UniProtKB/Swiss-Prot annotation:
Residues 110-215 are annotated as: Catalytic subdomain A. There are two conserved domains in the glycosyltransferase region: the N-terminal domain (domain A, also called GT1 motif), which is probably involved in manganese coordination and substrate binding and the C-terminal domain (domain B, also called Gal/GalNAc-T motif), which is probably involved in catalytic reaction and UDP-Gal binding. The ricin B-type lectin domain binds to GalNAc and contributes to the glycopeptide specificity. The lineage of its organism: Eukaryota, Metazoa, Chordata, Craniata, Vertebrata. It is an enzyme of class 2 (transferase). Detected in renal tubules (at protein level). Highly expressed in fetal and adult kidney. Widely expressed at low level. Weakly expressed in whole brain, cerebellum, thymus, lung, mammary gland, liver, stomach, small intestine, colon, pancreas, spleen, bladder, uterus, placenta, testis, ovary, skeletal muscle, leukocyte, B-cell, bone marrow, fetal brain, fetal thymus, fetal lung, fetal liver, fetal small intestine, fetal spleen, fetal skeletal and fetus. Detected in renal tubules (at protein level). It comes from Homo sapiens. It is a single-pass type II membrane protein. This is Polypeptide N-acetylgalactosaminyltransferase 14. Belongs to the glycosyltransferase 2 family. GalNAc-T subfamily. Substrate binds at D151, R176, S200, W305, R336, H339, Y341. Mn(2+) binds at D199, H201, H333. Residues 415-550 form the Ricin B-type lectin domain.
């Protein structure tokens, strides 16, 4: 009997041990994001990829639009085309994730996604590198399709030739539609249960998609974004971005990245935890397709580009969803300093129209602060927003007051929203902006005060805002240096920039940071036409420093 017992002990113990191991293994597989070794996802064999790429003549595709020696490499795309073409479409980039991200395991039944990339006259080298990075660094079974939407580029072959690549489809607009309507067109034909929007000058990093799809699979109302790394526009060096950033904005609806507060950082016990963000940059995100449709897609009446990220961000938060940045997902992006393409109504006018539509539909009584920051938006047409107001009502969305209190309490409400608008006069002359020879920003000068059809000439109308800026459209009075005699120039407005802040003291307009006063200096031939706008030490006796703000 003892011998029989001894014989049974080892087999029984072995079975129990195997059972325990199986129990822990199954439990581990059921956990959504436990720590452990990285899951190996199925990938096509090298031979399969080689066969697919053999059907595409990459050299011929790139050479057809190649930069030519002697041409300005920045002219067409506002980044260094020569350097982009020098770099392989298949280049390696550094893995910029936190080390703990590499230990996360994701479930194997993530939903495949439709990747939508819209573009207009994109450089072929960056477009191809975007697609190739997706194909190289994404598990094949997670890509339902890659939908390219060509927004009426000059050359249809920019898109058409790319359908030879695996998973790629091409749609071409018959006329320029802009980002919003192009994205909607791509989303309408998408067959995936989730939509992944990317810009056309990106490079996705290792295991970028799984963390995003995982968050949406857990909760379909989440809209999730990667951390956006920087691809240098001059050298195309891939640069790691800080992970503890979120999207923010000011009352002019100008997007800006902001650091998490010390309190928010202290609450983050794990660097892989998603970060709630009041607003997304808008270029790169994943959203459940049914949720996208239910929320009303995009505002179809927004033009070209700009402001759509505010509209969708307010709508998601106020109508029952949430926005997140997922630190374990990284995507590089070329950030340009200016747009390389033409806006039919001008960049500033288009942005004002789009943001004004957002303010009128979503910001309730707080839109007064938008108009105080952008006074020239008051008179701009913005189309009919009744359908978007009806959408908000039908979705039973929260108020903008709720959004400020619960999502973005850090946005301080101005104590006042008054605006003074009109001429800045010196006797019979008015401060005027004059644009010459297609220069990017106009010059300042004194000119005879003028009227057009009974109204003050637009080039002579200025607004003095509660932010202590003197502006015209998107441009603010600023100084190059803080020294006497420094020229006063027009630059893009930026809230909080002390070089752009002024105060009216009696007949003086004083620059706050330098304590110098707005003045005119003679130059050139010494005539009235040769007066330069500068700042100088304030002197009450100088008539050249006496200014009147005359309301329109």
């Amino acid at each position: 009997m003892r011998r029989l017992t001894r014989r049974l002990v080892l087999p029984v113990f072995g079975v129990l041990w195997i059972t325990v191991l199986l129990f822990f293994w199954v439990t581990k597989r059921k956990l959504e994001v436990p720590t452990g070794p990285e899951v190996q996802t199925p990938k096509p064999s090298d031979a399969d990829w080689d066969d697919l790429w053999d059907q595409f003549d990459e050299r011929r595709y790139l050479n057809a639009k190649k930069w030519r020696v002697g041409d300005d490499p920045y002219k067409l795309y506002a980044f260094n085309q020569r350097e982009s073409e020098r770099i392989s479409s298949n280049r390696a980039i550094p893995d910029t994730r936190h080390l703990r991200c590499t230990l996360l395991v994701y479930c194997t039944d993530l939903p495949p996604t439709s990747i939508i990339i819209t573009f207009h006259n994109e450089a072929r080298s960056t477009l191809l590198r975007t697609i190739r990075s997706v194909l190289n660094r994404t598990p094949t079974h997670l890509i339902r399709e890659i939908i390219l939407v060509d927004d009426f580029s000059n050359d249809p072959d920019d898109c058409k030739q790319l359908i030879k690549l695996p998973k790629v489809k091409c749609l071409r607009n018959n006329e320029r539609q802009g980002l919003v309507r192009s994205r909607i067109r791509g989303a309408d034909i998408a067959q995936g249960t989730t939509l992944t929007f990317l810009d056309s000058h990106c490079e996705v990093n290792r295991d970028w998609l799984q963390p995003l799809l995982h968050r949406v699979k857990e909760d379909y109302t989440r809209v999730v974004c990667p951390v956006i790394d920087i691809i240098n526009l001059d050298t195309f060096t891939y640069i790691e971005s800080a992970s503890e950033l979120r999207g923010g904005f000011d009352w002019s609806l100008h997007f800006q990245w902001e650091q998490l507060s010390p309190e928010q950082k202290a609450r983050r016990l794990d660097p892989t935890e998603p970060i709630r963000t009041p607003i997304i940059a808008g270029g790169l995100f994943v959203i459940d397709k049914a949720w996208f449709d239910y929320l009303g897609k995009y505002d179809m009446d927004m033009d070209i580009w700009g402001g759509e990220n505010f509209e969708i961000s307010f709508r998601v938060w106020m109508c029952g969803g949430s926005l997140e940045i997922v630190p374990c997902s990284r995507v590089g992006h070329v950030f340009r300093k200016k747009h390389p393409y033409v806006f039919p109504d001008g960049n500033a006018n288009t942005y004002i129209k789009n943001t004004k539509r957002t303010a009128e539909v979503w910001m309730d009584e707080y839109k007064q602060y938008y108009y105080a920051a952008r006074p020239f938006a008051l008179e701009r047409p913005f189309g009919n927003v009744e359908s978007r107001l009806d959408l908000r009502k039908n979705l039973r969305c929260q108020s903008f007051k709720w959004y400020l209190e619960n999502i973005y309490p850090e946005l301080s409400i101005p104590k006042e929203s008054s605006i003074q608008k009109g001429n800045i006069r010196q006797r019979q002359k008015c401060l005027e902006s004059q644009r010459q020879n297609n220069q990017e920003t106009p010059n300042l000068k004194l000119s005879p005060c003028a009227k057009v059809k009974g109204e003050d000439a637009k080039s002579q109308v200025w607004a003095f805002t509660y932010t202590q800026q003197i502006l015209q459209e998107e441009l603010c009075l600023s100084v190059i240096t803080l020294f006497p005699g420094a020229p006063v120039v027009l630059v893009l407005c930026k809230n909080g920039d002390d070089r752009q802040q002024w105060t009216k003291t009696g007949s003086h307009i004083e620059h706050i940071a330098s304590h110098l006063c707005l003045d005119t200096d003679m130059f050139g031939d010494g005539t009235e036409n040769g007066k330069e706008i500068v700042v100088n030490p304030c002197e009450s006796s100088l008539m050249s420093q006496h200014w009147d703000m005359v309301s329109s």
